[in-house]
Amino acid sequence: MRILGIETSCDETGIAIYDDGLGDSPEGILAHRLYSQIAVHADYGGVVPELASRDHVRKTIPLIKEVLADANLTPKDLDGVAYTAGPGLVGALLVGCSIGRSLAYGWELPAVPVHHMEGHLLAPMLEDDVPEFPFVALLVSGGHTMLVRVDAIGEYKLLGESVDDAAGEAFDKTAKLLGLDYPGGPALSKMAESGEAGRFKLPRPMTDRPGLDFSFSGLKTAAGTLVRKECLNLSDSDLKQTHADIANAFQQAVVDTLAIKCKRALQQEKLSRLVIAGGVSANTALREQLAITTKKLGGSVFYPRPEFCTDNGAMIAYAGLQRLKAGTDADLTFKANPRWALDSLPPVK
């Protein structure tokens, strides 16, 4: 079966076609295109929802045409249309939902609304080395940080989540404090590479108590306090190094916090396989630390290739195909669901 996937939940327009006849591997991705709105939002220091929606309107249909041409296919060669229905920015979601549902109707194909975080969770299934069920998943991005027990597709148990800022959001806000341009998360990670480890110490939030929830708001505040305290009356070279040292301390605090919680989750659920997905899962320091953590537990860690860590159409196409094979076909009264609980999804039978 072949399915078109449409992703428009935030500030990236992702379109892909996936064919399960080629297996759960990179070869199943017949074509994919991704358009990022970084240039649109850079002057504002963050995503402007109205501008995001308008840009999705401008780019979605042209990208669909390009992906069909890349795969040398026509709509008659497809078996369904999948689109992100939530969570995300409601205006951005409505663009993808309306286009996806309309195309499915016009092409006389099933329409499959997809949960954005289920797409991220299943993204490692697009690799050659795929995890077996059950496993613990760490979903970590700009909008979400959560730990989930996964027994099968659609069988999800929420173990813990952020009670305030997501990890990716904390990265971006701290990067702004350090004078880095939007999007700041990757830039902060790059800056941290030249920082002196151990010069500054920041807290590991909520690791001193039981439970698997996260909190990054206080860590962001602590980093801001450190910037204001340590970055006064410095030469340009000293300021640059101090910023790098603070970036290193911040990143290590986030990585340690995530690793501690992942270890707890694996031990609590008596599992050995860990999946990490979402934009922050591309962070090299996080991958290295979680590899060490799982190895000590006799387990292993799985993650998507970097290009599929961020929002993309391939993960939506793959997740949508699993739902399509289970009989999902949305009626014409579709809706966007900006606050859609992952553990409310029905299992795939």
Curated annotation (Swiss-Prot):
Q: Tell me the superkingdom of the source.
A: Bacteria
EC number(s) recorded for this UniProt protein = 2.3.1.234
Q: What does the note under cofactor report?
A: Binds 1 Fe(2+) ion per subunit.
Name the predominant localization.
cytoplasm
Sorted UniProt keywords: Acyltransferase, Cytoplasm, Iron, Metal-binding, Transferase, tRNA processing
Amino-acid positions noted as binding Fe cation in the UniProt annotation, renumbered to this chain: H116, H120, D311
| Name of the protein this chain belongs to | tRNA N6-adenosine threonylcarbamoyltransferase
Q: Which organism is it from?
A: Colwellia psychrerythraea (strain 34H / ATCC BAA-681)
Lineage of origin: Bacteria, Pseudomonadati, Pseudomonadota, Gammaproteobacteria, Alteromonadales
Q: Which gene encodes it?
A: tsaD
